[in-house]
């Protein structure tokens, strides 16, 4: 009788453990990888990636860490698939897995954190944790010297989510208020003249000799930095991997 009872208890414990495992809900880390170099990834970001079983992100960003974390399951999507990536992260977490959603720079600055929290309202069981990273504004500033010593404004020239009219208003407002301005996403194939337009707005309030700078591929292979005037910057060709700095009076 004692043996039978012991076997029944053992079976009950096994069933209980299986139910607990089936009901386990995972966690999503939203991780800022920094500008790109391994040395610029924070210890907290590295630790969160070590804890994660699944890594999700834009193809370029997952490619930056595959070699360092080869034992993870990787799920990648091309650009403009942000909602799909969030859905993938939540689906994996609902299976009980620990997930890392990776972004360049800082996840809360033009990253995935906001969208994940918005979509996370439909998954109240899933725990979200934002892991901060070094954003391009900081990384590029360190390359140039110290352009962000006082008040400054960070503005993205991408009009995918923000109408250009609103971006123009923000540029003019920052220039009129004499902020140092840091520009993200200054150009692309479809927005080749956006930096020139931004400089023209700023020239209405600032001198053509205003000191400016830009850094391409911050913290990555082929990093390139230049210091020039605002009038020179207006006619400079840059790309989406460039961060631009415009000084003040």
Residue ranges and their predicted role:
Residues 2-3, 20-128, 139:
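Class I S-adenosyl-L-methionine
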Residues 9-10:
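Cationic, low-complexity basic patches in intrinsically disordered or flexible, solvent-exposed regions
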Residues 21-25, 47-48, 92-93, 121-122, ...:
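Solvent-exposed alpha-helices and their adjacent loops that cap or buttress functional pockets
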Residues 28-30, 98-99, 176-249:
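A contiguous loop/helix-start segment that scaffolds small-molecule binding in enzyme catalytic cores
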Residues 33-40, 161-164, 225-228:
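Short gly/ser/thr-rich secondary-structure transition/capping motifs
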Residues 80-85, 136, 160-162, 219-222:
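A short acidic, often aromatic-flanked loop/helix-cap motif at beta-alpha or helix-coil junctions
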Residues 109-177:
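Class I SAM-dependent methyltransferase SAM-binding "motif I" and its flanking Rossmann-like core
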């Amino acid at each position: 009788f004692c043996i039978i009872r012991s076997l029944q208890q053992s079976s009950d414990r096994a069933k209980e453990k299986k139910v607990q495992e089936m009901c386990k809900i995972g966690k999503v880390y939203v991780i800022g990888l920094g500008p790109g170099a391994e040395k610029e990834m924070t210890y907290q970001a590295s630790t969160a990636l070590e804890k994660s079983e699944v890594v999700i992100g834009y193809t370029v960003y997952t490619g930056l860490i595959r070699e360092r974390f080869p034992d993870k399951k990787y799920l990648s999507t091309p650009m403009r698939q942000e909602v799909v990536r969030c859905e993938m992260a939540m689906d994996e977490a609902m299976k009980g897995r620990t997930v890392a959603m990776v972004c360049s720079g800082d996840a809360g600055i033009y990253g995935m954190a906001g969208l994940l929290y918005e979509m996370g309202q439909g998954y109240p069981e899933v725990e979200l944790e934002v892991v901060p990273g070094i954003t391009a504004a900081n990384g590029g500033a360190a390359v140039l010297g110290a352009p962000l010593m006082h008040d400054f404004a960070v503005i993205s020239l991408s009009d995918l989510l923000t109408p250009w009219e609103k971006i123009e208003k923000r540029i003019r407002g920052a220039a009129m208020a004499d902020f140092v301005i840091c520009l993200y996403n200054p150009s692309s194939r479809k927005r080749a003249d956006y930096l020139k337009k931004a400089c023209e707005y700023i020239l209405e309030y600032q001198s053509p000799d205003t000191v400016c700078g830009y850094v391409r591929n911050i913290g990555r292979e082929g990093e390139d930095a230049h210091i020039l005037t605002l009038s020179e910057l207006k006619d400079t060709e840059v790309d989406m991997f460039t961060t631009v700095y415009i000084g003040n009076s």
